[in-house]
């Protein structure tokens, strides 16, 4: 998740090191481990729910990374999200590629957490599919729950963004 705050751009990461699932901030090729260090959070999802982003920013500014990305296995950014809600055919070039027409209402569908793929992991093609659908995908990570959110208030509910594969 890239978070742009006043001073520091933070790139969060979930990863496995020596068989333990952890999370931290990636700076170039070094990771500052945050597991259990910010509000007792044991995962990035936990950090977001505990509203620990500002505290993570302060911690990262004084604790440079010491773990190389060469020593970890990437995990999906948020391995256990509450919901994964997807919007399909949301840009015109992709609609043209699929020989479909633009719908009046967005095409909404869901994914399961187990379908996520982490950075540098292979994407498995289902047997029922002839090919993979190559497209740029982005995740919007919600930090605040809400219902009937006004468009002008929507950004207040977003904690970050990420490239996304599933």
Question: Over which residues does each language-model region extend?
Answer:
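N-terminal non-catalytic cap/leader segment that marks the start of a structured domain
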Residues: 9-106
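Glycine-enriched loop-and-adjacent helix/strand subsegments that border the catalytic/binding cleft
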Residues: 81-166
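Short, Lys/Arg-enriched N-terminal segments with co-localized hydrophobic residues
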Residues: 1-9
